Amino acid sequence: MFQSLKLTHNSSIPFLISSGGTTSRAAADNHWVLDLRKNYQNISYDLNNTCVEIEAGVTMGDLSNFLVNYKRSFPIGLSGKTGMGYILTGGISPLSRSRGLAIDQIMEIRGFWGNGEQFHLAKPKESKSSILEWKGLCGAAIFLG
């Protein structure tokens, strides 16, 4: 994946990513498209800390079906066909009022910025200012002050 990002950066060809089944921007003329749905489908559950790790191609329906085995749930919204974009854009669901947005459930995220640099962001456990920065990143900025 990293090589694909570097190639598009050097050639100035626009780059699109697809990870679910509902985006209107999964393909376009004269664009590179990286479809994560086929090769990034892993889901794992850590019984010790009750955290789930998912790869970028997992749909919310697949996640929900997986979590049933552990008597767990995730606020996936009204469609099981959405992918990682659902979470990264906030993720409003019927459970949002009581459980928060989907993005509020994220403990850490790893990926690549548009320029090809890797990143790893984790929910802070220390200072109040770090927690406010994390909440702002997760979409709560308009409620913070």
Feature roles, as predicted:
Residues P75-G145:
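FAD-binding subdomain of flavoenzyme oxidoreductases
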Residues T8-N10, R25-A28, Y45-D46, L67-V68, ...:
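Extracellular/periplasmic catalytic domains that process cell-envelope and extracellular macromolecules
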Residues F15-S19, L34-L36, Y45, I54, ...:
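General beta-strand structural signal in soluble alpha/beta enzymes
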Residues M1-Q41:
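Glycine-rich N-terminal segment of FAD-binding domains in flavoprotein oxidoreductases
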Residues S4, D62-N69:
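Short active-site loop/helix that positions an aromatic residue
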